[in-house]
Amino acid sequence: MPTSKQIINKKQDEVSDIYGKEMIRVIRSLLKHKIIDTESLSKKTGYSINTVRRALYTLQKMGIVRYINKEDKTLWQLLETDYEKILDTLLEPYKKEEKAETGELLFICPKCGRKYTLDEAEMYEFRCPEDGTLLVANQ
């Protein structure tokens, strides 16, 4: 059974693959500072201001950060302080999409009416294991 650290590392890798490795560094820096301006965040992470802003706008759309206008500066405030929850929030739309993709496609045996998932159909080489009939996609 995977440890908590292994689970977080896996989620972190997935976020990095989807959003880029800069997202992880921006999140970690936000966790340390709670409220920070874009320029300081750019210096702390070593990424350009545009790269940092892209990450921040994505985090804002997901409800993880909000911006505060204070005098001439835009400050960014982290709304969620649990690293794993932040990763889960970022991965949620992709997990839903993944479930929808795998959940929609079924294969049916026209002879006996049994239904098979894509994985099962591939395993049986798209033939019904009961009667050998070629399976038909049902969408």
Swiss-Prot record:
Keywords: DNA-binding, Transcription, Transcription regulation. The keyword Repeat does not apply. One of its GO terms (biological process) is regulation of DNA-templated transcription. Monomer. Interaction with RNA polymerase subunits RpoF and RpoE is necessary for Tfe stimulatory transcription activity. Able to interact with Tbp and RNA polymerase in the absence of DNA promoter. Interacts both with the preinitiation and elongation complexes. This is Transcription factor E. Belongs to the TFE family. InterPro entries: TF_E_archaea (IPR016481), TFIIE/TFIIEa_HTH (IPR017919), TFIIE_asu (IPR002853), TFIIEa/SarR/Rpc3_HTH_dom (IPR024550), WH-like_DNA-bd_sf (IPR036388), WH_DNA-bd_sf (IPR036390). It comes from Nanoarchaeum equitans (strain Kin4-M). Residues 7-91 form the HTH TFE/IIEalpha-type domain. The keyword Membrane does not apply. Pfam families: TFIIE_alpha.
